[in-house]
Amino acid sequence: MSKLNKSIVAEFESAQITRELPKFSQGDTVVVNVKVKEGARERVQAYEGVVIATKNGGLNSSFTVRKISHGYGVERVFQTHSAIIDSVEVKRRGKVRAGKLYYLRGLEGKAARIKEDLAAAAAAKAARLAEKA
């Protein structure tokens, strides 16, 4: 791809990216509020789980959230800049060392828990308080 084409694609992508989501990474517990259309009406549905993977690719970036529902593991892949995402809230910062947490698929119960990163949580709280003041 030539430099001209790359610059045109980059300009188009920057125009399409309309909002900023909060910073989160693998191991964080997030609540994704998803717009669900049922017939003529639209409502917002919360999907809470652990981020097990992120793919950063500009406009094509995505993240995978895993939760346990009625004893079964459920994973959902969200496009980061999708219109169906109403908002994302970080509930808990996880302390993990791996880039992708696919190993959680084979674990259940207490073994599937992730330690909380208290330092990151305190820093995020301080940043929120400074932003409000």
UniProtKB/Swiss-Prot annotation:
One of its GO terms (cellular component) is cytosolic large ribosomal subunit. InterPro entries: Ribosomal_bL19 (IPR001857), Ribosomal_bL19_CS (IPR018257), Ribosomal_bL19_sf (IPR038657), Translation_prot_SH3-like_sf (IPR008991). It holds the Pfam family Ribosomal_L19. The keyword Heme does not apply. HAMAP family: Ribosomal_bL19 (MF_00402). This protein is located at the 30S-50S ribosomal subunit interface and may play a role in the structure and function of the aminoacyl-tRNA binding site. Belongs to the bacterial ribosomal protein bL19 family. This is Large ribosomal subunit protein bL19. It comes from Stenotrophomonas maltophilia (strain R551-3).
